Structures are given as structure tokens and as C-alpha cells.
Amino acid sequence: MLFRSLELLIQHDFYYESSMMGHDYSPYRVRQGDVIELQMPMQFGDKTRLIEMPISWSQDDHPHFEMTSTRPGHRNANSVMENWVDDFIYMTRCTDWGIITYTCHPYVIGRGHRMLMLERFITKLQELGADFMRMDHAARVYDERHPYL
């Protein structure tokens, strides 16, 4: 995230954002004013009220299925589903509470065999006890658990 972007998000009262990819399962408060100097320990800035929601390229359909100049794409949908389910299982084993964000683009996931995989995936997560919610609701749940002081 660009330095000015954080200022603008805070200035315009954004509640959450999800571009930093700082954690796979735990939301956290975005810091402002970190100091990074060569050959020196990092100095952390102050936490802001802005909540960073977890997101990861490994839980995004685009890198797995679409061809780019650096990736072949067209992975087997079932192997992607297996990885995504295992990510959820790992989260439930290793955290007391967490959020896992799966990013699905209509033009990527919306192909026949991938839609069938998505149906199986949602059913499997339901069987494993997943709660499905919008990102703004998940951010509010985090905020209730970890109020900004």
C-alpha cells in the first residue's frame, strides 16, 4: 500500500481494507508511521482504527486458473479445492478464531467445472462448521473482539 493510500483510507473513514496480505487468518490494526532504515531495526508506528482483513494469493482463484505471462493457469479444480479446504482445516486447528478470505472472480470461477468445484467446496466448508459472512460483518466481529483504544 502506498503511504498516501493509508492516509486517504483513514481520512475518508474506511472501516477495513484488504491489500497488505500481512496474515493469512487474523485481522489486525493497520499501523501508520513505521520507520524502515537500512541496517537498522524496524520501528513500528502507531496502530490506527483501520482494520486489515486477511487475504492471500493462495486463496484467490485467479493465480490458479488464469494464464498470465508468469503462470500457466488451468490448474485442476479439485486440487485447488483440496488446498482451500486444507487451509480452512489448518486455520481451525491453529487459531481460536480467524477469518479466511477466498477470492473468486466471476470470469474465473464461472466456468462449468469450476462452478461444480465451488458448489462442493461450499458444501464441504459448511460440513466443517464454517460461518459465511460479508467482509464488513467479519471486520465488525473482529472490532468487537479487539476494540480500538
Q: Predicted segments — roles?
A:
Residues 1-96, 146:
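Active-site-adjacent pocket scaffolds in enzyme catalytic domains
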